[in-house]
Amino acid sequence: MSKIRVHEYAKKNNISSKDLMTKLKEMNIEVSNHMTMLEDEVVNKLDNEYNTGAEKPSVADEFEVEEKVVRSKKNSNKKKKKGKGNEDKRQDNFAGRQQTQIVETPDKITFSGSLTVGELAKKLSKEPSEIIKKLFMLGIMATINQDLDKDTIELIATDYGIEVEEEIVVSETEFETFMDEQDDEENLKERPAVVTIMGHVDHGKTTLLDSIRNSKVTAGEAGGITQHIGAYQVEVNDKKITFLDTPGHAAFTTMRARGAQVTDITILVVAADDGVMPQTVEAISHAKAAGVPIIVAVNKMDKPAANPDRVMQELTEYELVPEAWGGDTIFVPISAIQGEGIDNLLEMILLVSEVEEYKANPNRYATGTVIEAQLDKGKGTIATLLVQNGTLRVGDPIVVGTSFGRVRAMVSDIGRRVKVAGPSTPVEITGLNEVPQAGDRFMAFADEKKARQIGESRAQEALVAQRGEKSKLSLEDLFQQIQESDVKEINLIVKADVQGSVEAMAASLRKIDVEGVKVKIIHTGVGAITESDIILASASNAIVIGFNVRPDVNAKRTAELENVDVRLHRIIYKVIEEIELAMQGMLDPEFEEKVIGQAEVRQTFKVTKVGTIAGCYVIDGKITRDSGVRIIRDGIVIFEGQLDTLKRFKDDVKEVAQNYECGITIERYNDLKEGDIIEAYVMEEVKR
């Protein structure tokens, strides 16, 4: 008899891999994971266990008995309630008469937010004049309708020997805070896994998505017509898998930045002939930051230069070790263009789903996340929603982000009109008053009026929040957040000009340990700071450290928009010193660098006794005569110094604005080339 893997035996005997692994542990047989090989002796023992087991009562019988018990309980409760009603009323009336005679001081009072003097007096069973007198003795002049803060309320109540408890009231407008609360275990049912495909450019992400869709979705459909709604479902072995049709990092970054966790499993596509590339590393960082299981699909196995062993070797550096080498990462060789290995990949997704046990409660109002949204001339606002919990029905009042409405129509991923959508189901809906953003959370309600009120309140709150935007984690307020126990771990993204600098800086930063707060480096890379780095920092509340590199124009704009702290340095020990001082609360810089503009070198002229004159075009901001400058070539800083001359035509000028040409010479530097970026900056005093 040949050896067999755990998951193969489980499949053969119609049991889950997880149950089988539990059974093996009960039999004192150790297995590391579902890919472990089982010896013949173990297989025989398992056969005996499963063949001789006592018959269990059917699920239908259990359900019937349980239903009878529940019904009998409900009936008994009704009887009790009928008998109690009049008795309770009599007791209440008697208590009311007693209260007019004797007023007892309570042992404990509760409040939320604040109380007026009159409200506090009522809760303490005292006269308002008595409370006003006590406040006067404490040096507080107050009237009966004046609001009192938490400290004053506690001070007065303590004086009477009464305990005070503040109630934290969660507004319905902030439904995100309680929509992810766990349901009771008995209400949870198995749901399909939600999968995102990530990887480097041209490694076959889109081809893989198309290959899965064409082989599974269109089979058996009338005319084979599918509708692109940003997500689709496939059926494998009578089980469904939901794929987000957004290859790349969008499904992770923009959604995670808004607090939405959509993906259950990540498929990391790596070309067998190309190996690990920069965006592959970026994808790994995103998946790990989100805490999502990774399955590696080694693509392009049909190519002559394919070398899967090299891919495995390179990925071990990022803690993705194949099961064949003693790790726990699943590697599946595929050829997306020829459709080879697709079935095996889908089976592995089902296997991970089975082990992870993804569940949801279908018997409640729907909650979930927006995948895509747009404005259509004929239909109005269209939004693709992923139902994550509950069941969404046509006609349900719904709040999506700051918009609201009623679900007028729902269309599935295959273009069919549907009336209901359960957990992990993507649907396209119409009926919202505004276009929401990808990553916005949604919740269905029982009452349309209530949904409208909550939607309008959320829109108003978002407007107020936008005016007083709260910044992300920054070095200036780091110590305060540590003191308030808000920060136990500091997330950093490190970018440098060469790999050696990245490794040296990462190693030095990891050694910092102040006040029990650890440094966690969530991503490292070589080259300029990109928009993708800023979005990852925003989603993970991280600080970006740049060593000898600069952010590009898009990254700079996104950093300002997302309030991400970007720190740029040219000396390693200063980076370490700055982080350490910030963690100790000693960081107190007097000046802050402010980049005021960038100019691109379009042409160079060499003039005797003058040096190199750069004919430039100002592409962003402005260049001023008294600003410091740095020369950036291919995203790397190669020189830093001062302007020597700044001219428009033949005239010396104080500044040149955006979209104008100028002539620039730089002190003690003549090696200017076409395509170089001259970045101008000034040092501004920072108020503390």
From Swiss-Prot:
Residues 245-248 are annotated as: G3. GTP binds at residues 199-206, 245-249, 299-302. Residues 190-359 form the tr-type G domain. Residues 199-206 are annotated as: G1. Residues 62-103 are annotated as: Disordered. Residues 224-228 are annotated as: G2. One of its GO terms (molecular function) is GTPase activity. Residues 335-337 are annotated as: G5. It is found in: Cytoplasm. InterPro entries: EF-G-like_DII, IF2_II, IF2_N, P-loop_NTPase, Small_GTP-bd, T_Tr_GTP-bd_dom, TF_IF2_bacterial-like, TIF_IF2. Residues 71-83 have a biased composition (Basic residues). Pfam families: EF-G_D2, GTP_EFTU, IF-2, IF2_N. Keywords: Cytoplasm, GTP-binding, Initiation factor, Nucleotide-binding, Protein biosynthesis. Residues 299-302 are annotated as: G4. GO terms for cellular component: cytosol. Belongs to the TRAFAC class translation factor GTPase superfamily. Classic translation factor GTPase family. IF-2 subfamily. One of the essential components for the initiation of protein synthesis. Protects formylmethionyl-tRNA from spontaneous hydrolysis and promotes its binding to the 30S ribosomal subunits. Also involved in the hydrolysis of GTP during the formation of the 70S ribosomal complex. This is Translation initiation factor IF-2. It comes from Bacillus cereus (strain G9842). The gene is infB.
